[in-house]
Design a protein with these regions (language model features):
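Solvent-exposed soluble domains appended to multi-pass membrane proteins
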Residues: 1-181
Length: 181
């Protein structure tokens, strides 16, 4: 299995939007569709591999393009009016795990738009699309501990001594890191 063509992102693509390590996934996929269409017209059978960068550590710049909220939503009883109020605590804002979740949301949107664009171009007929990750997100167990044990009422993280504490042991931590499945 060899490659007949290789498209270099900084030579064959217009770097019109960068996020993190390079060209944004949305721009990359948008620009890839005409290239795929050309290859599809020239070849009866072909294989292509596309590498996404936006959902790659260190997840920098993602706040600029993702509106995904990494907050803890909860209801608090208001004794004055007897109603429950919707509250929000931005407990993962500014954390690596929060940025990772935002980048996953962005990647999901980019892949969804890519699939729509491929379908609109008639490129999904007789096609198999495989999506996989090549490694985990490199998130420390302490970040997951905050995720599973955040207390919005005290704006703190539960400890092992607190009721309701969820231990993020080695098994559970590694289970969340297993890639691709």
């Amino acid at each position: 299995l060899g490659y007949d063509d290789f498209f270099n992102y900084n030579k064959d693509f217009n770097i019109d939007e960068t996020i993190g390590l390079g060209l944004s996934d949305k721009s990359f996929f948008r620009q890839a569709v005409p290239k795929i269409d050309k290859i599809n017209k020239e070849h009866d059978k072909w294989y292509g591999a596309f590498l996404m960068l936006t959902n790659h550590t260190p997840f920098t710049d993602i706040e600029r393009v993702s509106d995904y909220e990494v907050d803890f939503k909860y209801k608090m009883y208001n004794e004055e009016d007897g109603m429950y109020e919707e509250k929000s605590a931005p407990f993962l804002e500014g954390t690596k795990l929060g940025s990772y979740f935002k980048s996953v949301h962005y990647a999901d949107q980019a892949i969804g738009q890519f699939m729509t664009d491929l379908d609109n171009a008639g490129l999904l007929d007789n096609t198999v699309v495989v999506i996989y990750g090549d490694h985990d997100a490199k998130i420390k167990a302490e970040e997951y501990d905050r995720y599973f044990n955040y207390n919005p009422f005290t704006d703190s993280v539960l400890t092992e001594d607190d009721e309701g504490y969820v231990p993020v042991d080695d098994f559970y931590y590694n289970l969340n890191r297993k890639v691709p499945f």
